[in-house]
Amino acid sequence: MLGVTMGDANGVGPEILVRAYAEGAMEDAFVVYGDRAVLEYAVERLGLSPSLASRIPLVDQGLLRRPDITPGEMSTAVGAAAADYVVAATHDALAKKLDAIVTLPMNKEATRASRPDFSGHTELIAEVCGNPPVTMMLASDQLIVTHVSTHVALSRAIELATTERILEVIRLTHDAVRRLRPQARIAVAGINPHAGEHGAFGAEDDTQIRPAVEQARREGMDVSGPEPGDTVFYNTVRRNRFDAVVCMYHDQGHIPMKTLDFDGGVNATLGLPIIRTSVDHGTAYDIAYEGNANIRSFLLAMEMATRLSGRQE
């Protein structure tokens, strides 16, 4: 059973959910964590059969009513509810009531009103799970990337790129890629221009990244690096030298992924005691409930959750 959190009620999450269900595209057993009022609103707004809302399996959180829904607008009440959906689904996954959870987008600013330290789904779910070491993975047909750090300032990202953390992410990446691809050839991107060029542009590549790569090789992993950041994605996507890239910071991985396949990327959190995948896009307030949101990333996230949880036959 997959648990689906409906995300921010003023964004595209509920629309994507009900449209995917209406189109018969949700093949896996699932249950939604959210509010009945939001489902009913989405069905009505999209001109779908009124009975559809009652047919969608739901763990009704009872947090939002119809007047709370203001499409395209940021709402602190809606942001708080979206976080609570995620927490509820995570607890049920930890209790083995769910095989995996699939999350639809939240708005960080809307959620921070009730959770001042909120920085994203990844960190919230990790907190509920006891804060194990985790990494964000983005995956599409063309590219898989993971991140040593994500939602922090670039100056802080450089500080976080320690040998221990990089090795941790390499291990998590290797384990996940083995379940998704025939091979697990991992490239580790450098942090400085030209991977430091032997210290000419910074020492971190040689003093922090290279030792992690060497240790991963000793553990039997097929790992290369530090690879220059300006060529590693070309060598991965065009030359098929690697199956995944470990990136040192948020934009290093997100820019190539979203350039290659904005609608077809899937986000997964590696290192949790549960399986969690997500769409690789935001709330898109500007098109909420207009019937134009792309459901592809959501369906791929459902598919990946099934594969990672071992439920696929």
Q: What does each model-found stretch correspond to?
A:
Residues 109-113, 133-136, 144-147, 154-156, ...:
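Short, well-ordered, mixed-charge alpha-helical segments that flank or form enzyme active sites
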Residues 1-121, 164-248, 252-266, 272-275, ...:
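Contiguous, glycine/small-aliphatic-enriched amphipathic segments in soluble metabolic enzymes
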Residues 53, 138-160, 164-167:
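Ligand-binding beta-strand-loop-alpha-helix segment within the catalytic cores
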